[in-house]
């Protein structure tokens, strides 16, 4: 992981000038209610693009293109870019800005009410690249990870603390970590300071990449069982697994103890200490012994 963005100060003025010109030309303002912080650092854009590893044949879905700084770079590299924007005030500006790009398509919609199948119109491989508004980060990740038509990879800008939770290791993992790791392999690309955006957010951000393979370590595990057990395990975090699962699942302690012993897990441990392999064992034990 790269810890800083050395090109931030040098590259910001050019993109900042472009952002101000576009905002003045279309009488635009960053809408706090939509969590808008427009990216103005070429150095940060370069890191996103390097992580995305785009090819001329790739299809990209971008959530919340904003003023189009990232969109423009994506269009230079990918075969098709489909941007989904909720803010009606940005639609005309984006349509005009990218009218010369035949590989650009803009959808005016709420991403949380639009499935990948509806966006793409067909079953094709795609990648998700986005500077996500903080307030919909978890919902967007969940939507695409749980979708029938999942992306090959996701490169997203999120709040730094959320990024730390996503990439946490065994011992520090929470429900968000498990939710992401059930479907893919997350990694932290770079921490991004507030000055990379206009207006700057009050907290730092981070670029996270999630690769979604054809098969994962959780292959063969019921999605329903996994999340049922995980939510129960983390429902009362300070409790031991024995107590948390018994309370969360509404099952007697002797039965839970039998499940944990069958999976080779000490009942005195806590949910955050389990590895993905141990969660898999527990899920398979649970599936094989319906309570």
From Swiss-Prot:
<feature type="binding site">
    <location>
        <position position="110"/>
    </location>
    <ligand>
        <name>S-adenosyl-L-methionine</name>
    </ligand>
</feature>
<keyword id="KW-0963">Cytoplasm</keyword>
<keyword id="KW-0698">rRNA processing</keyword>
<dbReference type="GO" id="GO:0003723">
    <property type="term" value="F:RNA binding"/>
</dbReference>
<keyword id="KW-0489">Methyltransferase</keyword>
<comment type="similarity">
    <text>Belongs to the class I-like SAM-binding methyltransferase superfamily. rRNA adenine N(6)-methyltransferase family. RsmA subfamily.</text>
</comment>
<feature type="binding site">
    <location>
        <position position="37"/>
    </location>
    <ligand>
        <name>S-adenosyl-L-methionine</name>
    </ligand>
</feature>
<dbReference type="InterPro" id="IPR020598">
    <property type="entry name" value="rRNA_Ade_methylase_Trfase_N"/>
</dbReference>
<keyword id="KW-0949">S-adenosyl-L-methionine</keyword>
<keyword id="KW-0808">Transferase</keyword>
<dbReference type="InterPro" id="IPR020596">
    <property type="entry name" value="rRNA_Ade_Mease_Trfase_CS"/>
</dbReference>
<dbReference type="InterPro" id="IPR001737">
    <property type="entry name" value="KsgA/Erm"/>
</dbReference>
<dbReference type="GO" id="GO:0005829">
    <property type="term" value="C:cytosol"/>
</dbReference>
<dbReference type="GO" id="GO:0052908">
    <property type="term" value="F:16S rRNA (adenine(1518)-N(6)/adenine(1519)-N(6))-dimethyltransferase activity"/>
</dbReference>
<dbReference type="Pfam" id="PF00398">
    <property type="entry name" value="RrnaAD"/>
</dbReference>
<feature type="binding site">
    <location>
        <position position="85"/>
    </location>
    <ligand>
        <name>S-adenosyl-L-methionine</name>
    </ligand>
</feature>
<dbReference type="InterPro" id="IPR023165">
    <property type="entry name" value="rRNA_Ade_diMease-like_C"/>
</dbReference>
<keyword id="KW-0694">RNA-binding</keyword>
<dbReference type="InterPro" id="IPR011530">
    <property type="entry name" value="rRNA_adenine_dimethylase"/>
</dbReference>
<protein>
    <recommendedName>
        <fullName>Ribosomal RNA small subunit methyltransferase A</fullName>
        <ecNumber>2.1.1.182</ecNumber>
    </recommendedName>
</protein>
<feature type="binding site">
    <location>
        <position position="39"/>
    </location>
    <ligand>
        <name>S-adenosyl-L-methionine</name>
    </ligand>
</feature>
<dbReference type="InterPro" id="IPR029063">
    <property type="entry name" value="SAM-dependent_MTases_sf"/>
</dbReference>
<comment type="function">
    <text>Specifically dimethylates two adjacent adenosines (A1518 and A1519) in the loop of a conserved hairpin near the 3'-end of 16S rRNA in the 30S particle. May play a critical role in biogenesis of 30S subunits.</text>
</comment>
<feature type="binding site">
    <location>
        <position position="64"/>
    </location>
    <ligand>
        <name>S-adenosyl-L-methionine</name>
    </ligand>
</feature>
<feature type="binding site">
    <location>
        <position position="131"/>
    </location>
    <ligand>
        <name>S-adenosyl-L-methionine</name>
    </ligand>
</feature>
């Amino acid at each position: 992981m790269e810890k800083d963005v050395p090109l931030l100060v040098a590259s910001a003025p050019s993109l900042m000038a472009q952002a101000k010109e576009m905002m003045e030309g279309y009488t635009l303002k960053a809408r706090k209610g939509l969590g808008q912080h427009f990216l103005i650092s070429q150095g940060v854009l370069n890191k996103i693009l390097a992580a995305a590893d785009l090819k001329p044949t790739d299809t990209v879905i971008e959530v919340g293109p904003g003023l189009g700084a990232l969109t423009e770079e994506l269009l230079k590299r990918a075969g098709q870019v489909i941007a989904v924007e909720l803010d009606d005030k940005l639609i005309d500006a984006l349509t005009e800005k990218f009218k010369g790009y035949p590989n650009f398509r803009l959808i005016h919609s709420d991403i949380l009410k639009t499935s990948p199948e509806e966006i793409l119109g067909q079953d094709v491989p795609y990648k998700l690249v986005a500077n996500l508004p903080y307030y919909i980060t978890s919902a967007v990740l969940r939507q695409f990870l749980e979708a029938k038509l999942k992306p090959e990879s996701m490169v997203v800008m999120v709040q730094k603390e959320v990024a730390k939770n996503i990439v946490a290791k065994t011992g520090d993992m929470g429900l968000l970590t498990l939710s992401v790791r059930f479907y893919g392999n997350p990694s932290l690309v770079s921490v991004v300071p507030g000055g990379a955006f206009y207006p700057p957010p009050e907290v730092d951000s981070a670029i996270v990449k999630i690769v979604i393979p054809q098969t994962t370590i959780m292959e063969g595990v019921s999605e329903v069982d996994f999340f049922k057990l995980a939510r129960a395990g983390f429902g009362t975090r300070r409790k031991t697994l024995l107590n948390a699962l018994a309370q969360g699942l509404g099952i007697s302690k002797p039965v839970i103890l039998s499940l944990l012993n069958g999976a080779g897990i000490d009942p005195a441990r806590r949910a955050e200490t389990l590895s993905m392999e141990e969660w898999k064992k527990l899920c398979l034990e649970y599936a094989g012994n319906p309570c």
